[in-house]
Amino acid sequence: MNIKVSLLFILPIFLLLLTSKVKAGDIVVYWGQDVGEGKLIDTCNSGLYNIVNIAFLSSFGNFQTPKLNLAGHCEPSSGGCQQLTKSIRHCQSIGIKIMLSIGGGTPTYTLSSVDDARQVADYLWNNFLGGQSSFRPLGDAVLDGIDFDIELGQPHYIALARRLSEHGQQGKKLYLTAAPQCPFPDKLLNGALQTGLFDYVWVQFYNNPECEFMSNSENFKRRWNQWTSIPAKKLYIGLPAAKTAAGNGYIPKQVLMSQVLPFLKGSSKYGGVMLWNRKFDVQCGYSSAIRGAV
């Protein structure tokens, strides 16, 4: 009798824990755009993140020499950022994926043609991924993939994604991720996203009132459901880590945990939460507050 009672008591708890484990999501953060955010190795050692996007390779395309901009952390052109190799390898050794994010909000990148896109892909492969180059801006560390944070330029990103995917067939898994704006479909990345080559997509549900939860929760839900239709493996909600991290779109921690995450977890593609950025997360403790609910 006692055994039966115990089993009846334990089984629901076991099923709850199993469900929680299946639905557990990742936290993704952008690092590299403010020296106030601290070191990359400390970001990884915080235990808060599963993926870190190094931001940004902000100049590329139109057959120009690509340029990395880490906003005061180090000077790439003089080799000052090669010191990050040790940190990158440490992060990877503890299970954290390190991506290079290309693009951002500065008007210094574009893809003028398919050939231009393929050339950029070759540069990324040889300088940050599994290829070889005489001068690698981040040293010999091999990053886990490329993040497309594309807000400007011509829509030749299909060719860029396909060429990177071709390179990725040579050995180590190469992840492709993207951070489109929440209006659906994304005017620059839709074609690339429809190829099915992207592993993770973190949609920026901020700086776009029409699809932000705090502006209109029903529109937010409709947009999320639309985004789940793309052939990506996992879909994430992208949010500012503090009110001051973006013009609008901030969701209070308790609202996210009590109202938003339960809805998102209804999707089989739910992947977790992306935060902009590490500096604001350090200041406001957003990820540490939501970690257990993600």
From Swiss-Prot:
Its EC number is 3.2.1.14. Keywords: Carbohydrate metabolism, Chitin degradation, Disulfide bond, Glycosidase, Hydrolase, Polysaccharide degradation, Signal. It comes from the Eukaryota. It holds the Pfam family Glyco_hydro_18. GO terms for cellular component: extracellular region. It is an enzyme of class 3 (hydrolase). GO terms for molecular function: endochitinase activity. Gene3D superfamilies: Glycosidases. The active site is at residue 151. It catalyses: Random endo-hydrolysis of N-acetyl-beta-D-glucosaminide (1->4)-beta-linkages in chitin and chitodextrins. Residues 1-24 form the signal peptide. Belongs to the glycosyl hydrolase 18 family. Chitinase class II subfamily. PANTHER family: BASIC ENDOCHITINASE, ENDOCHITINASE. This protein functions as a defense against chitin containing fungal pathogens. This is Basic endochitinase.
